[in-house]
Swiss-Prot record:
PANTHER family membership: SEC-INDEPENDENT PROTEIN TRANSLOCASE PROTEIN TATA (PTHR42982:SF8)
KW S-adenosyl-L-methionine (keyword) present: no
Job of this protein: Part of the twin-arginine translocation (Tat) system that transports large folded proteins containing a characteristic twin-arginine motif in their signal peptide across membranes. TatA could form the protein-conducting channel of the Tat system.
Listed GO CC annotations: TAT protein transport complex
Keywords, comma-separated and alphabetical: Cell membrane, Membrane, Protein transport, Translocation, Transmembrane, Transmembrane helix, Transport
Gene giving rise to this polypeptide: tatA
GO BP terms, alphabetized: protein transport by the Tat complex
Transmembrane segments: 1-21
Protein name per Swiss-Prot or TrEMBL: Sec-independent protein translocase protein TatA
Pfam family, any one: TatA_B_E
Record text on subunit structure and interactions: The Tat system comprises two distinct complexes: a TatABC complex, containing multiple copies of TatA, TatB and TatC subunits, and a separate TatA complex, containing only TatA subunits. Substrates initially bind to the TatABC complex, which probably triggers association of the separate TatA complex to form the active translocon.
Source superkingdom: Bacteria
GO MF terms held by the record: protein transmembrane transporter activity
Length: 81
């Protein structure tokens, strides 16, 4: 139960033979094989490209830090008497 029995495969093959004819089946299988081969080669090519595009870890740049805070100003409130 749940799997295909041998007689299921016989029915599937018979349907293919009736639909496509015995002469067209080898050509259909050949073109399906070519399509699968092209598909696999494209997947391998995409994986090779994605491995080359991996981001490299960032390297810190050594730089001098400049103190940008203003010095504290002294109070200019002078009392004149």
């Amino acid at each position: 139960m749940g799997g295909l029995q041998p007689w299921h495969w016989v029915i599937v093959i018979a349907v293919f033979v009736l639909l496509f004819g015995a002469k067209k089946l080898p050509d259909a299988a050949r073109s399906l094989g070519k399509s699968m081969r092209i598909f696999k080669s494209e997947i391998k090519e995409m994986q090779a490209e994605s491995k080359g595009d991996e981001p490299k870890p960032a390297t810190p740049i050594a730089s001098e830090r400049v103190d940008t805070t203003a010095p504290e100003q002294q109070s200019t409130d002078r009392h004149t008497a």
